[in-house]
Amino acid sequence: MKSPVYGSVWIAVIWTCGLVCPSAAIEVQPAQTQVRLALDRGKEAAAHRQAPETLYARFGSDDDLHPGGFLVTKLAGLSVMATHMALRGLEPSAADIAQVTKAPTMLVSTVILGDNPSFAVNSYMVLDQGGRVVKPVTVRVDGQASRSQAWPESPKFRAKVVATFRYVDFDPNAPTTIIIFPATGGEVRFTLSFADIE
């Protein structure tokens, strides 16, 4: 694994315990039992007053001074939706569930850090799976970064770079490197094992 090149932009990917399971893999077509388990996981999280966003598959760091990110897979999306709804005393409808399970894309959200408020504009993200580059369907960035806790010291600003990737374009079981190309130059690589993520 290559060490990240930071320069004036620091990028990382966050990993937390959320939905990680040794026998899991990113499910492109979840079975009914997997859907039920994901919904139950969300209800249980709500019963324990756990924040819905803790159910995403995270990578990197999770504090304000270091960059990070998360994946929104179908099963994670179901758990998060069930948590949100259960916290309001509601149940997801069949249409709600179908909307998540039939989603054609997976979202990858990262936070990068830099030293000027527009440093993230025109940043880009790809997935590398053993030399095969997967391009995103969409990439969105914060046009105006927010101040980091380090302000006025470096890194002064935090901004999101969010991309969606079509499930049919990548291998949901492959070791994958998320590569972010900051607009200010350079590249940063973070390696994940999609086989370990639900």
Residue ranges and their predicted role:
Residues 25-198:
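Conserved functional micro-motifs across diverse proteins
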Residues 1-6:
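N-terminal secretory signal peptides that target proteins for export/translocation
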Residues 8-19:
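Bacterial N-terminal signal peptides
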